[in-house]
């Protein structure tokens, strides 16, 4: 039998349709400099949650729950109760009792294996590292070289596609034959077709796969290289935003399929490698989850019910009584869960302050290009495409040109030095000649005496130069600026009763030596600080011409009202406010009160966070605690500068009066919404199709990174090595590209800080309004009806229980 002899005939249209379906199931991962939280299961939302959970268990050995011990511990500590287990059992229609359910939990965390591939059968026949590791490593190195556009000084030939580059690299790599103990490997590589589509066809035909096996087989192949598959999906996502497409994911699938053909020993007798694989493959395909797996899924649902019960108890208490004194200021935060404790503390420190929640990009569909650079970055959710351009300006175009040229020269000098550092001849002589000069800085950074270089968009600026600049929109007609401002204010439910001061707070994080730092910044700003958006909107709303136009739209901002912008540092809970012009005497007094309240609120939140960060000894000493946090965020060795969005579990869109004073433990996204000001339901539609979806992405990234960090997370942060300058990270020196969150972002070394619960969305709106949005949008319908999140309704009567939308319609929540 020759190498290219067809083993089985198959319909090519069916084959390529199955390949397309497999590729469409892969969700994108964003690069490090735009690292946003993404659900790795986003493209599977057209299936039910339970169905996807079972598929992942069968195909990849992945689960969407914690292990049994975690749920036993939750019961022992009182976070979970028998009544929650019973509610979960009743909901599933199970005849088990809570005692039987607990008895069925696995005694130990068994290693699930998923569907076997041919490489697994061949693994035992070669020495370490083994075929699966060797294949993943080889594909990873090839993809890293192919996609690199920023780090390597040498890159492979890109005149053709990824598959062709991989095939050419394989032909040149003689070490593979040695590592695999397969002398004929190079000959087999030469027999591979030149085109990826043909390689897929040949692999399927030679391995004897039937049409009804292709969906599972292709899915298994891509799940083995999920990191690079997700990067290819990102390239496809970006191309489609521009009306184009990208086929690198199909080519990666062809590479994976070709490897299966390469490890085939070409024998077909009983006991051969192929025969053993076919037997194991068919047996695994017919396997159903054991009772222990079902018990884990029920425990996870019980924990969600326990959380919803706790949430309902807080929301059903008497509503907060508004302060009798006039409103001093209104402070708008991003809906990020880290803003909830600061909002609560701020309102407690100064009851005359009211807080609001809105997506941190503040409704501005912008892309930002820092002055003096060509590095444009999106400042809006990954779901959307930018429509407006923003840069920095001093207000004087001539001065802007001078500043831009000055910065470009500084950046060019720095780039030339970095190029010299990378030269092969510099590897030893550079250290010998200049190493001692770095000693002071090295010791200073190690001891926390020196801070890092700061935010990238401030690089190569002197402090005075940076202070002279502020974000500025590219020329835009006044009518367009008015319409933009009006849309944002209506979405914020901010169209009347304006206080003297309005403060728009973006947020950003601070850490050192952290490739995934953007993952701690504002997800609504595509992994960037929200400073640009906040300052831009404040400037827009303070513009006299825009205010006049808003008045014609029925939104009258009083002359005495001033809009300010600021930045919430989520790592230290310090708040910086940007004041570009002098305030009037009346506003200055209000500002001083607000500033004092912000400082007091920050101190209180730091005190509350101290224990989780291991700083309990200085929790009651505000200055020492702040100093410790500042040192912590500048510490090169700190793997947990902050906990990010760990613990997120809920999303509430309601008037602030419904949540004011409720301790939501920093676990809830809070979005201001008043359905009485939303006559046509457009604001609710926007909330359910944008912020709610973004919150779901965040929630699922944290959930999957916790339940299966090996596949959906990025492993040990200490071992991270950056790939391609900004693409992502390897754990160690190779393997698959790692996606998701590092274990240190979810686990404190003793226990999980994040509990994997699907998002509970609470909307304060009539049923009919909610149902209209669900009916109009397939994405929302998939999330709600397939169980990817839980949808609940908050009644205007605070004493009424929450209503949950389930298969039988809206039903009152127990508890």
Curated annotation (Swiss-Prot):
Role: Part of an energy-coupled inorganic carbon pump.
Signal sequence coordinates: none
Binding residues annotated for Zn(2+), in chain numbering: 334, 336, 507, 522
One cellular component (GO) term of this entry: plasma membrane
Subcellular location: Cell inner membrane
Family: Belongs to the inorganic carbon transporter (TC 9.A.2) DabA family.
Membrane topology term: Peripheral membrane protein
Cofactors: Zn(2+)
Keyword Cell inner membrane: yes
Species, as recorded: Ectopseudomonas mendocina (strain ymp) (Pseudomonas mendocina)
Quaternary structure note: Forms a complex with DabB.
Keywords per UniProt: Cell inner membrane, Cell membrane, Membrane, Metal-binding, Transport, Zinc
PANTHER family membership: INORGANIC CARBON TRANSPORTER SUBUNIT DABA-RELATED, UPF0753 PROTEIN AQ_863
Broad class of where this protein is predominantly found: membrane
Protein's name in the database: Probable inorganic carbon transporter subunit DabA
InterPro entries, per database record: DabA (IPR018752)
One Gene Ontology molecular-function label: zinc ion binding
Pfam families given in the database record: DabA
């Amino acid at each position: 039998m020759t190498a290219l002899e067809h083993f089985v005939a198959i319909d090519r249209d069916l084959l390529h349709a199955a390949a397309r379906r497999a590729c469409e199931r892969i969700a994108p991962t964003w690069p490090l400099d735009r690292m946003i939280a993404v659900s790795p299961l986003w493209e599977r939302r057209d299936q039910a949650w339970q169905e996807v959970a079972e598929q992942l268990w069968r195909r990849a050995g992945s689960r969407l729950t914690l292990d049994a011990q975690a749920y036993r511990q939750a019961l022992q500590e009182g976070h979970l109760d028998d009544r929650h287990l019973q509610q979960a059992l009743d909901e599933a229609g199970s005849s088990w009792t809570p005692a039987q359910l607990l008895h069925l939990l696995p005694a130990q965390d068994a290693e699930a294996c998923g569907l076997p591939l041919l490489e697994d059968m061949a693994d035992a026949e070669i020495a370490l590292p083994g075929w699966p590791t060797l294949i993943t490593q080889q594909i990873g190195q090839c993809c890293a070289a192919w996609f690199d556009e920023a780090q390597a000084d040498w890159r492979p030939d890109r005149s053709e596609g990824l598959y062709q580059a991989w095939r050419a690299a394989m032909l040149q790599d003689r070490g593979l034959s040695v590592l695999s103990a397969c002398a004929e490997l190079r000959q087999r590589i030469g027999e591979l077709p030149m085109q990826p589509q043909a390689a897929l066809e040949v692999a399927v035909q030679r391995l004897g796969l039937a049409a009804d096996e292709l969906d599972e087989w292709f899915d298994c192949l891509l799940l083995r290289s999920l990191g690079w598959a997700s990067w290819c999906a990102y390239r496809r996502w970006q191309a489609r935003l521009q009306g184009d497409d990208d086929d690198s994911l199909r080519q990666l699938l062809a590479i994976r399929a070709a490897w299966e053909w390469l490890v085939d020993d070409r024998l077909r007798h009983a006991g051969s490698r192929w025969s053993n694989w076919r037997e194991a493959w068919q047996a695994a395909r017919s396997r159903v989850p054991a009772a222990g797996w079902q018990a884990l899924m029920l425990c996870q649902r019980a924990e969600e019910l326990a959380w919803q019960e706790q949430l309902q108890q807080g929301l059903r208490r008497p509503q907060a009584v508004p302060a009798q004194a006039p409103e001093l200021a209104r402070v708008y935060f991003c809906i990020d869960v880290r803003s909830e404790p600061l909002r609560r503390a701020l309102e407690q420190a100064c009851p005359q302050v009211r807080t609001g929640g809105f997506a941190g990009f503040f409704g501005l569909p912008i892309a930002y290009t820092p002055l003096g650079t060509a590095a444009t970055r999106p400042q809006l959710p990954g779901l959307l495409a930018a429509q407006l351009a923003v840069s920095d300006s001093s207000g004087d175009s001539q001065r802007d040109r001078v500043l831009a040229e000055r910065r470009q020269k500084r950046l060019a000098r720095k780039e030339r030095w970095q190029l010299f550092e990378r030269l092969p001849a510099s590897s030893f002589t550079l250290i010998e000649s200049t190493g001692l000069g770095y000693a002071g800085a090295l010791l200073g950074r190690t001891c926390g005496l020196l801070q890092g270089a700061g935010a990238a968009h401030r690089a190569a600026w002197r402090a005075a130069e940076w202070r002279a600049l502020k974000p500025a929109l590219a020329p835009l007609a006044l009518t367009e600026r008015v319409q933009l401002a009006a849309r944002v204010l209506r979405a914020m439910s901010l169209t009347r009763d304006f206080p003297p001061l309005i403060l728009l707070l973006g947020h950003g994080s601070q850490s050192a030596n952290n490739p995934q730092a953007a993952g701690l910044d504002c997800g609504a700003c595509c992994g960037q600080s929200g400073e640009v958006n906040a300052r831009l909107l404040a400037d827009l709303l303070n513009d006299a011409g825009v205010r006049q136009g808003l008045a014609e739209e029925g939104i009258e901002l009083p002359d005495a009202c001033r809009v300010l912008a600021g930045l919430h540092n989520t790592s230290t809970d310090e708040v910086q406010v940007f004041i570009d012009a002098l305030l009037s005497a009346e506003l200055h007094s209000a500002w001083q009160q607000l500033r004092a309240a912000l400082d007091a609120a920050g101190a209180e939140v730091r005190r509350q966070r101290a224990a989780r960060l291991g700083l309990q000894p200085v929790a009651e000493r505000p200055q020492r605690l702040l100093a410790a946090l500042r040192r912590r965020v500048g510490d090169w060795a700190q793997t947990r500068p902050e906990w990010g969005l760990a613990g997120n579990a809920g999303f509430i869109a309601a008037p602030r009066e419904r949540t004011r004073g409720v301790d939501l433990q920093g676990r809830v996204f809070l979005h201001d919404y008043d359905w009485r000001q939303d006559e046509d339901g457009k604001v609710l539609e926007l909330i359910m199709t944008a912020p709610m979806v973004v919150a779901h992405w965040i929630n699922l990234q944290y959930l999957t990174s916790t339940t299966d960090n090996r596949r959906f997370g990025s492993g040990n942060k200490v071992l991270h090595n950056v790939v391609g300058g900004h693409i992502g990270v390897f754990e160690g020196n190779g393997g698959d590209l790692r996606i998701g969150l590092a274990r240190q972002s979810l686990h404190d070394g003793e226990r999980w800080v994040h509990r994997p619960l699907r998002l509970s969305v609470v909307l304060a709106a009539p049923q009919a309004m909610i149902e209209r949005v669900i009916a109009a949008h397939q994405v929302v319908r998939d999330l709600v009806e397939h169980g990817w999140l839980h949808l609940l309704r908050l009644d205007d009567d605070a004493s009424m229980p929450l209503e949950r939308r389930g298969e039988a319609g809206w039903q009152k929540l127990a508890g």
